[in-house]
Amino acid sequence: MSGLDAEQLDELEDYVAESLEEPWDKGNGRPRELTLREALIAASGYARNNITEEIWAEIFDVDQSTISRYIAFLTPLIDKATTEFRPSAEEAAQATRGAIALVDGTLWPCWSWSGERELWAGKYKTTGHGSLIIANLSGRITYVSDPVPGNQHDMAKLKGSDCEIILKAAGGVFGDKGFIGTDYITTPVRKPQHRDLYMREHDYNNQVSSFRAPVERAVAQLKTWRILFTDYRRPLKTFLSSFRAAMGLYFFKESFA
């Protein structure tokens, strides 16, 4: 349910317990409705499955408000506990320097909150936040940028960012048509307005797509943490911490592979 096995849960529980200001189980007074492990299963499982708090409440036989309170409390702690597992820009630059890199933009969908028009992503025809993902040729993710409002296209996300620094140090970069206009990213040929693509251009585009396939698979693997794939429902102000917690859990789990 949590997306983590018993060993991984043990380690995460240790990390989170160390960051608590006071013990989860004080040994006196009214006991908590859930143990720390159970609460972590609910909070991690919410990121993994993005099922409603009401269903988690039924699973643990507690009130929905209890689940909501524990998710709100533990998500920032999971974010903090897994920080070291999320690749930094410096680590990504070192891993990418001189190597072939792949880059792709993606959207993390969310509800269409009133008054938040900048979340509308025309490319995807829905609302959300966008990030750039960098991977190597084997599909291992080396960097995920922090999310920005969905109305920013890939080139806007790239310009002046850590991703730009990382990719410019690579030995070569493949991206999709969203990166046409850069002089260091190999992209497909865009269809001219007044003619079809030549056969050689089709072949070239197919070659570029084959190189890009690993990063597309990597993005799909990231989105098995369903909070990144289906509409984010919690208050908008909580998204960044939830995003970082989900990313942290992904890389934390990968560290056991």
Place the predicted regions along the sequence by residue.
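Short secondary-structure transition/capping motifs
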Residues: 1, 31-32, 45, 60-63
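Charged, often Cys/His-bearing segments associated with DNA-binding zinc-finger transcription factors
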Residues: 1-30
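Ser/Thr-centered flexible coil motifs
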Residues: 5, 35, 198-200
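A cross-family signal for key residues in well-ordered alpha-helices
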Residues: 13, 43-44, 159
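Glycine-/proline-rich flexible loop or hinge segments
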Residues: 23-28, 50-57
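Short, amphipathic alpha-helical "recognition" segments used to contact nucleic acids or chromatin
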Residues: 35-50
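Short, well-ordered secondary-structure "scaffold" segments embedded in the functional core
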Residues: 52-257
